[in-house]
């Protein structure tokens, strides 16, 4: 499902697969494939909440923090009463609580950072600081999906 450092399936399909394996684990807690099932849950969870190099969940571009398709899939998980539901809910809250602040920050000039004016450097630093704060919070939240 990951090809050339990008998802070859939609975020919605990743969410469906995560929910399938979490349901399988809950329905069959003593199954013979427990290690493999746990591996699938971690992989699909990481793919949903983090994405991959060419299909990121978090974008931090001028107008948005996260990919809208990814956020719809995360919403599906958040209302599913699954094992990942609390993580998805906290992820949504984190993005939502920072969305307005991100959108209100001044935009960078788009010129190479080496040629920034002091004002543009300050704007870039503000955006970088918020991005790093959000990434740190996301990393903390997603520890259950780390390998």
Which role does the model predict for each range below?
Residues 101-111:
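Extended, charged, solvent-exposed helical/coil segments
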Residues 24-36, 76-88:
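Short solvent-exposed coil/turn linkers within tandem alpha-helical repeat scaffolds
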Residues 34-39, 61-64, 89-92:
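Short, charged, amphipathic alpha-helical segments
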Residues 1-15, 47-79, 109-116:
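Short coil/linker segments at helix-helix boundaries
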Residues 1-33, 40:
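Long amphipathic alpha-helical segments with strong coiled-coil/leucine-zipper propensity
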Residues 130-147:
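Short, low-complexity, Pro/Ser/Thr/Gly-rich segments in the mature regions of secreted, periplasmic
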Residues 85-93, 112-116, 121-125:
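Membrane-proximal bilayer-interacting regions
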């Amino acid at each position: 499902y990951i090809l050339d450092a990008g998802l070859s399936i939609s975020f919605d399909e990743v969410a469906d697969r995560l929910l399938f394996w979490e349901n399988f684990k809950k329905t069959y807690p003593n199954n013979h494939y427990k290690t493999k099932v746990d591996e699938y849950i971690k992989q699909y969870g990481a793919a949903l909440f983090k994405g991959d190099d060419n299909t990121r969940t978090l974008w931090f571009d001028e107008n948005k923090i996260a990919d809208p398709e990814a956020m719809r899939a995360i919403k599906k998980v958040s209302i599913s009463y699954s094992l990942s539901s609390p993580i998805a809910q906290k992820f949504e809250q984190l993005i939502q609580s920072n969305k307005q602040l991100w959108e209100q920050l001044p935009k960078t000039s788009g010129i190479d950072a080496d040629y920034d004016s002091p004002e543009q450097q300050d704007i870039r630093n503000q955006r970088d600081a918020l991005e790093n704060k959000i990434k740190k919070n996301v990393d903390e939240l997603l520890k259950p999906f780390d390998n």
